[in-house]
Swiss-Prot record:
Gene it is expressed from: uvrC
Matches recorded under PANTHER family: UVRABC SYSTEM PROTEIN C, UVRC/OXIDOREDUCTASE
Residues that span the membrane, as ranges: none
Organism: Acinetobacter baumannii (strain SDF)
Segments forming domain UVR: 207-242
Recorded GO MF terms: DNA binding; excinuclease ABC activity
GO biological process: nucleotide-excision repair; SOS response
Keywords per UniProt: Cytoplasm, DNA damage, DNA excision, DNA repair, Excision nuclease, SOS response
SUPFAM superfamilies: C-terminal UvrC-binding domain of UvrB, GIY-YIG endonuclease, RuvA domain 2-like
Family: Belongs to the UvrC family.
Protein name (database record): UvrABC system protein C
HAMAP family referenced in this protein's UniProt entry, alphabetically: UvrC (MF_00203)
Cytoplasm as UniProt keyword: yes
């Protein structure tokens, strides 16, 4: 416990209620550090301040606590819902358990008539209207399914803006992956049948599809329509090939299967998704968690995952360990998603097979993670020896621009668990001379550390000049930061980097140094993040800057224009008459746009 806050904390602990509720741990400046729920507030909050706590992250949290606030609730379920709402609203640093919290990928069939498209996207129903299938654990697995659908049913996957502008079939038609509805080479009725078959495939109804294709092939052969018979034969062959690769179970249902394990300070949770009796795959998570009881840890993970990340919850959740608050979690999930949810830890037959598969995968995943974890720990250890001080958190900055255009500064964050992508930041640099990297770095550092805490090591990509500029910024902010500048070697060849320290010393580490490998890893990630964000900003600016000069053309109509023609090149090629087709534009504005673009 922080000694300065001890009297205040002890007074709070003495007056805590034994009712259920939510507690908030606050730092020196009143910042929210952690939100938790409790069946008994007095017992739970007091447990943080006993001498036997060994978990490093818990110790770090307790050392920063200066105040505690509590909110009493009528039930544990209410406490759980309130806790998750507060986490979603405030994102306290010690509650962040998932390093990768991207939404899952779904395949959707759009509601466009008469020619719907099939595509994939993150999140369910956020930007599209139609039927959704999934979740798929990765974009790769979703793309793999889309490729199969293209080959089987030739349903279009192109954007509407591209589809509406086609005058002749595209390459997808030439390689037999689309029936070219854009130019009318397929009737709406035949296309609708292909869409319906795609939906049946996504729903797992492959057995009936198989029988229908056999019947159509035999009928075509009987009618001496051999070309059509070959077409159905090829589809049937591909469908059987796909069926052989998929894990299909006898039970037609939906479930998520979750298995947790803990080894050598690393926690792993494996989630497998079964929909319509088909195993869609799974994903491994390595959450930063407080606690020692696997059941409670899995319960905390599930609350975080289903309330903060997932877009849906299946009717069954199968787990490899009993949860102490199973009933409360079921009730909270039912309230959140409006459906009954059952959590089961004792299962038989097919469900036992699912759980066994998840447990096999969680053991495989943690072995790989432990290997990476040990390597990363060794890299941190060697870097600590090089710099002569303990390091847990590293931040690195990089600047990216194209001849001074659309400058972006990136800040990436690493700790001994790897990249903390949720802590990454980007800074759009403004009001500087084009191409002035020093001014860009100065602005980024100032904006970052006016409020944010300093890391154990601040890496500055750029060497001595950038390091001196960073030292000036820290002096202006009244901060003492441990900083190292990294300059590239001759020919920018990896392994020849020089490290510059604030006292003027510099060293060049051996090419096989693990400390150097860590620095390269962090620096390269900062470069990747910066250049990705810069290109996105630059391309967006280039595509809209011409249109921004047109009076009376606001952001919405610019967006509609670009969407309709598939980009700025399509707008430039459009005739005045074609421009009038864009909804909400009108003849006068179309004439103005055409005149300005073609002056």
């Amino acid at each position: 416990m922080n000694q300065n806050a001890r009297p205040h904390i002890e007074k709070i602990l003495a007056n805590l209620t034994q009712l259920p509720g939510v507690y908030k741990m606050l730092g020196k400046e009143g910042e929210l550090l952690y939100v938790g729920k409790a069946k008994n507030l007095k017992n739970r909050v007091s447990s943080y301040f006993v001498k036997t706590i060994e978990h490093p992250k818990t110790q770090a949290l307790v050392a920063r606590i200066y105040d505690i606030e509590t909110l009493v609730t009528r039930s544990e379920t209410e406490a759980l819902l309130l806790e998750q709402n507060l986490i979603k609203q405030h994102r306290p640093p010690y509650n962040i358990m998932l390093r990768d919290d991207k939404s899952y990928v779904y395949i959707f069939v759009s509601a466009d008539k008469p020619y719907p498209r099939i595509a994939s996207g993150r999140g369910k129903g956020k930007h599209q209207i139609g039927k959704f299938f999934g979740p798929y654990p990765s974009a790769y697995s979703a793309r793999d399914t889309l490729l199969v659908l293209q080959k089987l049913f030739n349903v279009r996957q192109c954007e509407n803006s591209y589809f509406s502008q086609r005058k002749r079939p595209c390459l997808q038609y030439q390689i037999k992956r689309c029936s070219a509805p854009c130019v009318g080479l397929v009737s709406p009725e035949d296309y609708k049948e292909d869409v319906n078959n795609s939906i049946r495939f996504l729903q797992g109804d492959t057995k009936e599809l198989n029988q229908e294709l056999i019947a159509k092939m035999e009928q075509a052969a009987a009618d001496l329509e051999f070309e059509k018979a070959v077409f159905y034969r090829d589809r049937l062959s591909l469908l059987r090939e796909v069926q052989a690769q998929q894990a299909v179970f006898k039970v037609k249902g939906e479930a998520d299967i979750l298995a947790i394990t803990y080894q050598a300070g690393v926690t792993c949770v494996q989630i497998m998704h079964v929909r319509n009796g088909r195993m869609l795959g799974g994903k491994s998570y390595f959450p930063d968690m407080l606690g020692d009881d696997l059941g409670q840890m899995l319960s905390d993970f599930m609350a975080n995952f289903y309330f903060q990340v997932a877009d849906e919850v299946p009717s069954e959740l199968i787990v490899n360990t009993a949860l102490p608050d199973r009933k409360e979690l079921e009730e909270a999930l039912a309230q959140q998603f409006g459906k009954k949810v059952q959590i089961k830890s004792s299962v038989r037959e097919t469900r036992a097979e699912w759980l066994e598969l998840a447990e096999m995968n969680v053991q495989h995943a943690i072995k790989g993670q432990l290997s990476n974890h040990l390597e990363l720990n060794e890299r941190f250890h060697q870097l600590e020896q090089v710099v002569g001080r303990p390091i847990d958190r590293i931040e690195c900055f990089d600047i990216s621009h194209t001849m001074g255009e659309a400058p972006i500064a990136s800040c990436v964050v690493f700790d001994q668990g790897g990249a903390r992508k949720r802590d990454y930041r980007q800074f759009a640099i403004q009001d500087i001379t084009a191409g002035d990297d020093y001014a860009a770095m100065r602005q980024a550092l100032t904006r970052r550390y006016k409020k944010a805490m300093l890391p154990d090591l601040l890496l500055i990509d750029g060497g001595k000049g950038q390091l001196h500029m960073a030292m000036e910024v820290m002096q202006e902010l009244g901060l003492e930061a441990f900083m190292v500048g990294v300059s590239k070697g001759e020919g920018r060849k990896p392994g020849l980097e020089t490290l510059h320290f604030t006292d003027g010393t510099k060293i060049q580490l051996p090419e096989d140094s693990k400390a150097l490998h860590l620095i390269q890893q962090v620096r390269d990630e900062a470069h990747r993040f910066a250049i990705t964000k810069h290109r996105a900003k630059r391309d967006k600016r280039r595509s809209t800057s011409v249109l921004e000069a047109i009076p009376g053309l606001g952001p919405k109509r610019r967006r509609d224009l670009l969407t309709h023609f598939g980009g700025i090149q399509g707008v430039l090629k459009a005739s005045e008459k074609e421009l009038t087709v864009v909804p909400g534009l009108g003849e006068v504005m179309a004439r103005t746009i055409y005149k300005i673009l073609h002056e």
